[in-house]
UniProtKB/Swiss-Prot annotation:
This is Large ribosomal subunit protein uL14. One of its GO terms (molecular function) is large ribosomal subunit rRNA binding. Binds to 23S rRNA. Forms part of two intersubunit bridges in the 70S ribosome. GO terms for cellular component: cytosolic large ribosomal subunit. Belongs to the universal ribosomal protein uL14 family. The lineage of its organism: Bacteria, Pseudomonadati, Thermodesulfobacteriota, Desulfovibrionia, Desulfovibrionales. Gene3D superfamilies: Ribosomal protein L14 (2.40.150.20). InterPro entries: Ribosomal_uL14, Ribosomal_uL14_bac-type, Ribosomal_uL14_CS, Ribosomal_uL14_sf. The keyword rRNA-binding applies. Signal peptide: none annotated.
Length: 122
């Protein structure tokens, strides 16, 4: 459950390390985002000489949340951290590698590129 001002780890090799959510997309009154949702983020920490730099405003898709997500079979899944993958204007991942596991819900939301790059899909 991600809202405005939430900080997220970045789960790709785009060069950003931490980002802060500045808007949840999907309606004017939408407050929370969960796995598979797109948010607008600002880069708070970044490595030097990389694709993104501190202060960049980008879109990102949430791949892990600490708040559990209920699945249709009744099971729940939750992770140890809140993490996102940065997206470019076309909705494709900026990085070429994904670190850590991602949730299976991304497959249903057509983020197949992220699912194929991820080392583990839970």
């Amino acid at each position: 459950m991600i809202q405005v001002e939430s900080t997220l780890q970045v789960a790709d090799n785009s060069g950003a390390k931490k980002v802060a959510c500045i808007k949840v997309l999907g309606g004017s009154k939408r407050r929370y985002a969960t796995v598979g949702d797109i948010v607008v983020v600002s880069v708070k920490e970044a490595l030097p000489h990389c694709k993104v730099k501190k202060g960049d405003v980008m879109q990102a898709v949430i791949v892990r949340t600490r708040k559990e997500v209920r699945r249709v079979d009744g099971s729940y899944i939750k992770f140890d951290s809140n993490a996102a993958v940065l997206l470019n204007k076309q909705g494709e991942p900026v990085g070429t590698r994904i670190f850590g596991p991602v949730a299976r819900e991304l497959r249903g939301k057509n983020f197949m590129k992220i699912v194929s790059l991820a080392p583990e899909v839970l």
